[in-house]
Amino acid sequence: MDFKITSEYQPTGDQPQAIRQLTEGIQQGEPAQVLLGVTGSGKTFTVANVIANVGKPTLILSHNKTLAAQLYQEMKGFFPDNAVEYYVSYYDYYQPEAYLPTTDTYIEKDLAINDEIDKLRLGAVSALLSGRKDVIVVSSVSCIYGMGGPVAMQENIIKIHRGQQLDRNEFLRKLVDALYVRNDIELQRGNFRVKGETVDIFMAYSDNVLRVTWWDDEIDSIEEVDSLTYHRLASFEEYEIYPANLFVTSKEQQEIAIRMIQDDLVKQEEFFKSIGDGIKAQRIKERVEYDMEMIKELGHCSGIENYSRYFDGRHEGERPYCLLDFFPKDFLLVVDESHVSIPQIGAMYGGDRARKKNLVEYGFRLPAAFDNRPLTFEEFHSMIHQAIYVSATPADYELRESEGVVVEQLIRPTGLLDPEIEVRPSENQIDDLLDEILTRTHRDERVLITTLTKRMAEELTEFLLNHNVKAAYSHSDVATLDRVKIMNDLRAGVYDVLVGVNLLREGLDLPEVSLVAILDADKEGFLRSHRSLTQTAGRAARNVNGKVIMYADNITDSMQKTIDETARRRSIQLKYNADHGITPKQIQKAITSALPTSKEEAANGAASIRNIKGAEGSKQRVYIEPDTATMVADPIVRSMSKEELEKSIANTTALMKQAAKDLDFMQAAQYRDEIIRLQKELEEKG
């Protein structure tokens, strides 16, 4: 099936030119191209059109889960009839195994898996295994982490069709080999049950159940049914059932793996004894032998991923299989915010190896644990056939890879211009800045101020508050959820000024901000590099009155580059607007507050948090921060009976699962904290 893009919008501005150039580059075999697009220019829409034009399976790489979720939702909107999938880490919580020799502390691995994301990950792999060409996978850096190989996955696909002669028990054995679990009592995702001549399989990558019925040894019908009502949804002549886990292997390979593990255990035990370290020798012997017993009896053990090299049949040092192995060789890679995403890929391997070094050296793991790892950057690079790097500030790597093939997208559909940049001396900068702030507040506009240190941010905020300016600060010591609330409060007018250290975060969308003030702009370093200054200045690009003031006594090379590049873009935008009679329009964006903004609202939310409902036509929901919830809701909770508490826990659990299904992880975390508090109250009531 071909890609079919669906949108009420048509490419405008320089989007058509960017789409054409990128499409031609891919069709002509260009290995790498850069899409240099300014904030708000519709880069995602451009990429969607390119994907539709070239018709290649595409991996879109983002540098965090939240932005990946946004891209996933956008792409699903553009391609409702195609396979748009989501592949990120499925851990709600993850504490990796570690050993701290200085304190002789061993930290056991601890984790909580998000069932909904696990389903989406399996759905992504299943779509790729199906051979479809119209597949888009939006992924975080998880795509470079180890998983089962495509050959083993292919071998465990169960293909059935109506009229097929197939012994039912043989079919059940195949399901078990594909890591489905029999459960005749409660059918859950990844389970199957048997009732007479009917087998129900709750697909690991779907919300529905596959029902297969037999007539003697012949498959009589194949139907998809609703997992709750069991009403028939569809009938099939043939069907492919994909494995229930990404780490599938055969029994033969498992037996080979156990023998290899035992051989390596003997070698490692002898090594520790040869250096006179009997404690480590005893430790590795006990731990590995216990794991072997678990694998023989149950087919798995805690930390089985550390033995993945043996189960995959890989040699020592050979790279693991990852999501990229499931794509055809000519797939297209799109790296969003590439100036951040590419360095992140390069950093994964070193951190993983450093942690495992102590585990191996002190006898907690065999050396094979090193081979359960993310790809090195060189390995990742070797698997890329064609790539588009998307960024407003592409780094040297992307520019070098593209060999100058840079496609610019500088025109915004709204006609908004890049902000003017003005340099002012640092002498009396605070008084000057205060005057600028008052000018903005009279127009009901907002101000961002970026400093070099946390202390400066806090002291400047205190100064502004003493001068009756509604100000707040935000930096890394402020909790993530509090930062989100501060951003929403800034937009809502609770604050007029936000002071921070690093306010250049990609995706920070604050259309009310008309002034960005950069203090100590001439202090060269990471926070005042050309790319950081450009990203920071871009925060004022969503307001029709956008302006940037750099306070500095000298103009550094980074400042000059930012000023020159912004002026160049601005002149192009002005000319385009003049030629086409476009008047810049202020962006109007609804404020969707995720948290209560007052004690009264928090109290109302606490009273009704167990009755939150997404009514038809309504999107409003109430969140409670963990500390606020404890403070305002305890009197209500304490008055509840055991039955009411149990009902509240069940209702909130359902809401948590729905939030996770909607990829709203922040809300899911809020519900989780509420559940923990309710359970604690229930335990106290006995």
Explain the meaning of each model-derived region.
Residues 80-89, 303, 446-448, 460-482:
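Conserved RecA-like helicase motor-core motifs
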